[in-house]
């Protein structure tokens, strides 16, 4: 793609402030290329080749579109900015902070407008990158909006640049309302800024053809008045028609009410348990005191969508059963509204459209839970920045419960509660890690979607599936124990696979006898009191541990050593036959081999300074 | 510096094999620059601007010279290769391995000779670097030898390149005896290779002027027949004249017998203890059964030199006392001969020349021992790759023992036994790490020298000095305990400082009562037998620990938590007054801030492929 040159292209020397910024890096930047003069009016941009779009801010001032070239390992971004602005910043950071961020900057000194690859330090101060890896291809002003087209390799090997991987990316943005004399004069703390989570590197999965008899069913909340609070989880119960026969869901997609694109953050459809005949109707906030407790039994995920996700197509050889006597007719829709500006009076009927067919596919797709059992035996001390808990699906369980031909995992949804920061599931065979099933090094509990895997993973009998979650409890004063509560923690990977088996749950937790040995040592070693009396519950015991470094390190040592209790279950209550207690931890001797990052060849890059993009002319 | 162009410069296209190698990296390398045609005879190279020289191999086939520009953060290397060779490789790796090394390659396909920045993978297979960071400046053939001049930045930010720091660097070399059709066809395992340890980044310390009355004294072994075994430590006892009055040593330097430069690896001069009137004379291998035990009391380092080191100048305000009634007249010289090719019949009189003066300087320089007490309480489990032990010089000790104005540390010698891999001493004040006193991330017990610090460090009353050593016990089957034996371990930093104080030793070890609690837990938790009977020694207790992950992790947790016994001593046997047992570990809340690596700007680099250096002409 060539830079789009408008009328009046010209060459220009940089202003003193820019020369200064560039010389800080020891470069004598000789010539700056003015690639566009402002106010190109009346010409529409060419039709968009960008399959993915998201609003960056709740007002819809900034909209991002992008496409991905896996061959070239490059992303093209198109950023559209509404209204007259002095400039904009866009970029990525570990968890959405404005500090230590990898940025592209468009700013003006009042005279000229510049584009540059930059970064922010730990105080939010902005600096020019040594390597200009974001490459501007086009800058276009249309009436009252500005459109920037630029590209960047996934990996730049510049230590100041974010490494774009296929997990969650925390995009950051900021709006500059006034000129700055130089890039170094800008600090992100003084700007109107925000973040948006997205998966940038969507997998390239071929789209199976839809059969002729495909039908659709919209699961949507009817005309909700979006509350003017930052976070609302809205719950709505609906039901399938009576005697609805067996179908296969083969695709689903989001339907978002026009104008609310920046407010609807993510949505999920759950099927209720089959153990109850009927569920009460409900339409209101999920945390409402009026919400019937029974709705907690509607937890079986049927569909999940999050901002930026496109339609979800099941592999052509599998479908998800919908209807029939064996499953509940009741469905729960949950919509997460994210309204940080407390916008009032907005009405919404967003939801999910299921595409289903009566022509059943050869395989039924199932969902299996991997990770940790929901139990307080697994706990995280307070004030930890990166504490890891691991759950195992052991070789003995896959040997017993999987078919000889194995299963294929094609999608995955990672799940923790509020302190989760990373999740990974790895497949191991014969004591060696073989491949990553799914991984998110920038996991956010506020951004949960079902992700198609780039490569489906086949799990054979005797394989081990290891799911690890990393937690940050810096802001907690007490230990965080495992459990269902929002202030308790989970570590789960819901894997979507076929053919469906009886195995619904393959998880583990530390053996409780060994945990009691831990509490005993804590007691003896520290000469301090940890309640080990018979009536103390495990959460009470954890609450009385003095969290010195020895007790923290010893808890990690325990979890890395002690035998486990394995839940190799048909349903949450029914285990496969056998004794699953005091199982040894899988002995894994080698880690997954990670390919080296491929640094791009830098032969074609531009000069190591900011580009002048727009010259306003006059005013010197 | 400009490339030296000889007669017949010409442009040439690469041979097919090279084109292949380059295209593997996706580069279309258009043009290769032939910068030298072979066999430039009769012209001497210009006078060498290189202050540092070392032989790379024991035969003296390869000799390296270098200089350092701290301003530009660049090293210039000159590599001289004797005899007709098909090529040579030179580079750096973590600990001298030929795998995962950062290399420059000079090789021929029989027709042309090429130069390239390359790297070896974990199997020793050689690949072209994406970034060509070694830049060839001159290649010159003089009669039967080849001289290469090239430069490289300290830090390249290419993940395949070694980061050159001011610690030990393990240089690697290899000689190519035959042509290879391409770079990728070369594997280091098939070559004649070796390693050499050196400090590349010597500090830029100004050289104080020598006074008029300076005298010299040579401490050298008389006409030693170098044994034809790989490793010999040669011991030689000599003495100062009777009634030798007080002087100050102000400089020392190595005197290496000509022709033995590649065999003399390092040398040290020790002063014997003053507690004995006389020591027996001795001249022989240090491990000889004939060596008198008394010589073990000659341990006070006066001078130390290792390969590549230049003369050692004391700061002009300090000198090391030599002579007088308060110190022993007896000196021990230790010479380490490294003779891996078992060369026979070589005679040697190498040693150290002390430069001393009767005009005493304002301050006496002293040596203080930091790190761990020599005690089995501090132990390393077997089969550990990176186990860290830490010794503390506490605020209470520096408060009591240092003068109000503090002391200045100007040099440091790090010391461990065979399993030591890294050593660092950090200064902390008010609970925060402030600066690194000395650090070697590529420490080798076989390369011990006294190093001048780039910046002298002032230690005030109340400061804490933390010395950590990292050990590798992969090849051990039993725990390695602290102690004097060569198979036991030490963690010591001998710091050279002024003004001299009474504090000779400021070290620590874990409290023995807490270690006994550890053995007790090991016993209870594992239901296994660890001997805790009264007659068991600590080494016996460590020998009976079953080294599962829990007991390993818990030992680390103990050393990071348990109180310590501090040795704040005037001499090894005399403590400063007070109770130094059960002291709390210093509470350090922040680490030393490390500056970001400065990646070089790559604007001026050459094409991303190998250079053709020499065209032999004809033969197609």
Curated annotation (Swiss-Prot), chains A, B:
Tissue expression notes: Chromaffin granules of the adrenal medulla and synaptic vesicles of the sympathetic nervous system.
Positions of modified residues (Phosphoserine): 349
Cofactor binding note of this UniProt entry: Binds 2 copper ions per subunit.
Pathway(s) served: Catecholamine biosynthesis; (R)-noradrenaline biosynthesis; (R)-noradrenaline from dopamine: step 1/1
Catalytic residues of the enzyme: 233, 415
Keyword Nucleus: no
EC number: 1.14.17.1
Stored Pfam families: Cu2_monoox_C (PF03712), Cu2_monooxygen (PF01082), DOMON (PF03351)
UniProt similarity note: Belongs to the copper type II ascorbate-dependent monooxygenase family.
Function of the protein: Catalyzes the hydroxylation of dopamine to noradrenaline (also known as norepinephrine), and is thus vital for regulation of these neurotransmitters.
Protein name in the entry: Dopamine beta-hydroxylase
Taxonomic source organism: Rattus norvegicus
